[in-house]
Amino acid sequence: MPTYRDQAVVLRTHKLGEADRIVSMLSREHGKIRAVARGIRRTSSKFGARLDPFNLVDLQLVQGRNLDVVAQVECLHPYSAPLRQDYSLFTAAEVMVEAADHLVPVDREPAPAQYRLLAGALRVLGQGTTDGPRPPEMVLDSYLLRSLSASGYAPDLVDCVRCGTPGPHQGFSPSLGGVVCINCQPPGTPHPHEETISYLRALLVGDWTATRDVAWSRVREGSGLVAAFVSWHMDRGLRSMPLLER
C-alpha cells in the first residue's frame, strides 16, 4: 500500500473497537485527514500521547480505501499538555480545533492557510506572541477572525459593509458582516466603542503590538462581537463556544 508523510495538527479522536482510535487531523499538504491509530488505547502503544488533540505532529501514513492508517508519528510540539492544565487555554483551543474542522469541511482538500493559522494560534496560545503573552480570549478572537477571513468571510471593519460609505462608523452588524453606516443599520444594531473596532482590526491582521495596551473592557466587548459574527457565518455554530468564560 502507498505511504506518505505530512505534518498535521490533531483535531480530535474517536474510539474504534477495543484498542484503536480514529484520529482527525488538519495537515499541511493534504488538508483534513482521518486515520486509524491501531492499538493506541493499549498501555504498551508506541504512539503514547503523541496523537492527543492540539499536538503538532510529523507522521507517516498508509493510504487505505476508506481510512488511512498511522504508521509512524513524531510529536513536533506537544501543545496538548500545557493547554490542558489551564481551563481558559483548553476551552480556547477546543473552539479553535472545532472551527478548523468546520472551515475545512472536505477531507483531503489542501487548506494550507487554515493549517498555518491553526498551528500558529495554538503556538501563540501556549507560548505567547513575539510581543509577549496575550489573554486566551484575544488569541482565540484573532484566530476566529483570520480563519473566517481565509474562508471568504472577512468582516469589513472600515467602510459600511452594505453601501460602502467610507468609515469610521459606529454600528456593527454581525449578520451583515461588519460595520454599517447610520443609514444602513438594521434595528437593534450594537454600537461598540471606536477603540473596540480598532482593536478588532488589529486582531484581523495579527498586529500583536497594537493590542499591547488594550483595555480589558475593549477585549470583552470585542469578544462579544466576534462570537456573534461567528454564530452568523458558521452554518452549524460551534458547540464548544458556550464553554468559554466570556
UniProtKB/Swiss-Prot annotation:
InterPro entries: ARFGAP/RecO, DNA_rep/recomb_RecO_N, NA-bd_OB-fold, RecO, RecO_C. It comes from the Bacteria. One of its GO terms (biological process) is double-strand break repair. GO terms for cellular component: bacterial nucleoid. The keyword DNA damage applies. The keyword Oxidoreductase does not apply. Pfam families: RecO_C, RecO_N. Keywords: DNA damage, DNA recombination, DNA repair. NCBIfam families: reco. Involved in DNA repair and RecF pathway recombination. Belongs to the RecO family. This is DNA repair protein RecO. It comes from Cutibacterium acnes (strain DSM 16379 / KPA171202). The gene is recO.
